[in-house]
Amino acid sequence: MAGIGELTIGHSPDADDAFMFYAITHDLVGIGDGARYRHREVLEDIQSLNERALRAELDMTAISAAVYPDVAADYQILCCGASMGLGYGPLVVSREPCALPDLAGKRVAMPGPHTTAFMLSKMFLPPVEAVQLPFDQVMEPVADGELAAAVVIHEGQLTYVDAGLYKICDLGQVWFEETGLPLPLGLDCVKRSLPSDLRLQLLDALQGSIRAAFANNAAAVDYALQFGRGIDAERGEKFAKMYVNDLTYDMGDDGVAALAELYRRAAAAEIIPAAPPVDVLFPG
């Protein structure tokens, strides 16, 4: 904990995270039963939050599902706050229409190495030369003809057409066709070193914040649109609702099964050394 009574809470400055943290940010939901903890929100891109989690810096934080095997010793997954694609997810886009096998040996822009999109790319793409770029810079070199394709996350899933690019495939659709499960992309987790009652209070606060966002949809969406990175209101709301759904409030058995399958496949493909136990904190 970062000081007496202060909790550090990390999430990304994205429309979906802003929507689910709306009530916490605006002090509509407190942490704890009666005695409210002070909290300090840390807003950083997901790659930076992943790196902070690897150093166990924050009390509660958003992470990529792909990084959990590396932080499982320090963090426990919360049953709420997950970003799960329901038959959709990161996109592979190119300047000219083509098929996935056509990318073999080509240079492909990808977001950070700890992102779930990168893990999925290693599962489903042919062998390519990965070019690591910040997630919001992957499309430009493809549009300019410098790279063959890009793996696109966040708002780019809705704006790639504006850049004159073509969708080769939706990795979330490929995942669903093979597994029949939702695609776990992002998680919220809490430090194992915190007292068990405090971990449950943080879980309750985040679930309460998500519940309040659904109940105060217009205000929560207006707030979330401030983090839409230049996209219009209609697409900003669409993006937020893509990744804040029923499984965000409670991932349930389907979410746990999806995480287990993701790590099983990653271990089988030798992307990670071994599949970690999927340790999820539920209420009660």
Task: Mark where each language-model region is.
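Secondary-structure end/capping motifs
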Residues: 195-265
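A bilobed periplasmic-binding-protein/Venus flytrap-type ligand-binding module shared by bacterial periplasmic
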Residues: 23-24, 89-99, 183-198
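A structural signal for short loop-to-beta-strand junctions that line the ligand-binding cleft
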Residues: 7-8, 74-82, 107
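Bilobed "Venus flytrap"/periplasmic-binding protein-like clamshell domains
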Residues: 3-28, 90-148, 155, 257, ...
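Extracytoplasmic small-molecule ligand-binding "clamshell" domains
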Residues: 16-20, 30-64
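Pocket-lining segment of extracytoplasmic ligand-binding domains
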Residues: 136-225
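Beta->alpha turn/N-cap motifs
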Residues: 45-47, 56-69, 134-135, 152-158
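A local structural motif
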Residues: 29-42, 124-137, 272-278
